[in-house]
A protein has these predicted regions:
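Ribonuclease/tRNase effector modules and their secretory precursors
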Residues: 1-98
Length: 98
């Protein structure tokens, strides 16, 4: 299922980040490394997100009640595909080249 509005507000996402309530998938870390981003660089990209970077929201394949916000920000290396999911007040990040 998809929709055109984000279920998670950017201010909530950024607050979770600032509180250290964030983790990343292994594939996100590998994708970031391929783009020469370390984890701190990924977090900096998230902190710089604006509403205009939003692309879509979709549910996870495993659970259609869990929503993922997809952003496509432009970085120094080009546009990236960034999925953000909040589960139990923890931000989960997926990051790869678009």
């Amino acid at each position: 299922m998809e929709k055109a509005t984000p279920p998670y507000k950017l201010q909530v996402i950024k607050a979770l980040l600032e509180a250290g309530k964030v983790r990343s998938t292994q594939s996100a870390l590998a994708g970031a490394a391929a783009l020469r981003f370390n984890f701190a660089g990924v977090l900096a990209v998230i902190m710089s997100l604006t509403p205009k970077d939003f692309y879509k929201s979709m549910t996870t394949h495993a659970n259609h009640r869990i929503w993922q916000d997809v952003y496509r920000p432009v970085t120094d290396v080009g546009e990236v595909y960034l999925k953000l999911t909040v589960v139990d007040e923890v931000l989960i990040v997926s990051f790869k080249e678009l």
